[in-house]
Amino acid sequence: MTAVTDPITRPASGEMSLARPAGVLHDLTAIAGRALRAVPRDPAAVMPPVFIALFFFIVNIATLKRLTGNHPGFSYTAFEMATAILLGVTGVSRAPALVLDVQSHYLDRLLLTPVRRTAILVGHMAADVAVAAVLTAPILVLGVILGVRFHGGVLGVAAFILLAALWSLAFAGFGYAIALKTGNPAAVNSAFLLFFPFLFLTSSYVPRSQLAGWLSTVAGFNPVTYLLGGLRSLVLGSGWQWGQLGQALAAIAIVGVISMTMCFAALRGRVKRGAQ
């Protein structure tokens, strides 16, 4: 009696394995790379904030600089550059693109894959940090042309860009929360409106010492006040103002904790609804 055995199929010589590369780093790189590749194809998502920031930077200097021209050692151009930077990077994120992924059901298909759920958001946010850092360049170049100097040299410039990018990341969480919760492009695009009270109820255009009454009180509770203080400490005064930089980082952290809690909760809700 002859025994019959099933032949073992072995991969042909030179045949490549199609197994999915494992690891959270691969997931993050794939998501962030896709988000970054989409940026040049969607300039309308990133260019308007920069143009608006440059416009108000120039206009505010032209109209308000002479009011502080008699104060020696004070540069209103340097003072106002921090406000322009926040206008340029706040609300800039790939959240509108994520809404399109929701509407096209690409996100639902992505959730069926082994990709880590947190990598979906973190990958997009990594791309946001890179984009925000690049968007600071036109404003910084204009500021330097107009006479702004960083007391910390190259390190001061790097710290300025880092603070701006971290703030952009912290605020972007609100956009992602709205995108995942509603799947509505109009709602996501209106997320920037959340920033306006923070921008105007603070020392955006005059030093905090010049604010009076209830506005001064509100500014004391506004995280943007401390962020502006940290940014301005790099271009006004002398040396590293560690206290102000620490307050700026703390303000970013508070906003970031709130926004990230909201957006990751929205992601869990989206995953749960997709599983039903």
Model region roles, listed by residue range:
Residues 33-52, 240-242, 246:
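Membrane-interface helix starts
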Residues 55, 59-60, 75-146, 175-178, ...:
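Hydrophobic alpha-helical transmembrane segments of multi-pass membrane transport proteins
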Residues 60-62, 179-221, 225:
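Transmembrane helix segments
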Residues 38, 61, 65-66, 100, ...:
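Transmembrane helix-loop junction
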Residues 38, 151, 202-258:
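Membrane-interfacial helix-loop-helix junctions in multi-pass membrane proteins
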Residues 2-13, 235-239, 250-276:
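Junction motif at the cytosolic side of a transmembrane helix
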Residues 117-192, 241-264:
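Alpha-helical transmembrane segments and their short interhelical loops
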Residues 10-32, 171, 214-225:
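Short, membrane-interfacial amphipathic segments enriched in basic
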